[in-house]
Amino acid sequence: CGWTGIYVSKDKTKDMIWPDMIWIYVLAYDLWNFAYTYNCISDHSVYCGLILLLSCTIPTFFIKKGAWLQHRAQTLALWIMFVMTVPSFADRLAPVPTTHNKTAFFIVSFLSLAVNLIAVIYQFSLARKNKRNILKDEIYVDTNAYKQVMKENL
């Protein structure tokens, strides 16, 4: 959605702000990413899935709205640097094994798929209703979430 809408905040932090990345996108992405890590590297999903996603999502909702993309890049970079420096952390030093239950894998994946489909349908219907191009226009400019991000960061 409208990558041209990304800008640098005007405050002293100079954060990268993407106001069109509202809560629905963040939650849909988080669910998709957790489902991926849970299904593909399940014994690491607590660290590289849940905790890593929460570390960028919590600040987005409670500290700096609109900066999720920057928070994600920073936390992912820190995690990768840490895990490359201490590769045995997730496997031997502090393992958190999962059940490897196929039903749990399916439920997490199905929930992720359902939420992401709802997000896509919402995004396309909003774009169509407001005659916006999803590749270059900001889609959510009329939403309260978008307006709040703009108000806090301009």
Question: Model-derived features: where do they sit?
Answer:
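Generic multipass alpha-helical transmembrane bundles of integral membrane proteins
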Residues: 1-67
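C-terminal transmembrane-bundle signature of multipass membrane proteins
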Residues: 48-153
